[in-house]
Each structure stands twice: as structure tokens, then as C-alpha cells.
Amino acid sequence: MRDDVAFSLRRFKLPKHERLARVDAALERFGLADFAERSPHTLSGGQKQLLALAAVMVIDPILIIADEPTTLLDLRNRDRIKREFARLEQQLLVVTHDLDFLRDFDRVICIDNHRIAADGRPAEVIDFYQDLMAQRPL
């Protein structure tokens, strides 16, 4: 698993000790340090999701796009991701149907039928989305 995270750093020409330190820090950050030597194929779905996030975060991107980042995560790890996202300095774009996850965001946008249907504070947009979905037949 350590190699998978390190692969993200291949284009940065970092000294080996710095590359390893960054990889270990990313694994620790996402609660994966104890699994560093395991093959990703042996991980649970939630652990694979955390590994994917670690592989992105290790490069310290200026923009992070996360598509359903809480999928397959238990509540403990979902909260870990929420805390990690809250402390980011980077711009963060999250695509999710996990409405509770969005409650502390600065801004939420609801897309419906390929257009922006609502844009604003989380509580307002979440209420809008729930009302919109309640009006739709199953």
C-alpha cells in the first residue's frame, strides 16, 4: 500500500527520505499506517476509499475534487474525512448525496437535470433538495 501512495509522488523528483516521510504521514493521517505493507487488494472497501484519498492528499494539490468520498466508510472514518476536509487550506469540491456530510461546508450547490437548481448555505440547499426529492414519484 505504501507503494501505491508513493506512486502519486513519482513526478515530483523528491529525495527518497522526503518521499517516504510524506507517504507515511499521509497513511497516518487516514488511519492506514498499520496497513502500510499490505496489498491494496486485501483492504476493505472503506480502507480502499481512504487509500485513494491518501494518494491524492500526499501531493498537496491546490484543488481537490472528491466524488462520493464517504462511500463505503463507517461512521468513524466518515467523521475522519469530514475533519480532514475541514482543516484543508485548498479549494475543495465534493460531489455527494451524503447530506449530513455537507452541513458544515461554506457553500452547497444542488444540480438537478444538468442545471444548478440551488446555490447557497448548506441548510437552505439541503432543505431545497429534500423538498425537491419528496415531490418526485418513486
Regions found by a protein language model. Name each.
Residues R2-R10, L20, D24:
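Short helical segment in ABC ATPase nucleotide-binding domains corresponding to the A-loop/adjacent helical element
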Residues H17-F35:
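Conserved ABC ATPase "signature" region
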Residues S39-L43, Q47:
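Conserved ABC ATPase signature
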Residues D60:
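Conserved catalytic motifs of ABC-family nucleotide-binding domains
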Residues I64-D67:
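Catalytic Walker B motif of ABC-type/P-loop ATPase nucleotide-binding domains
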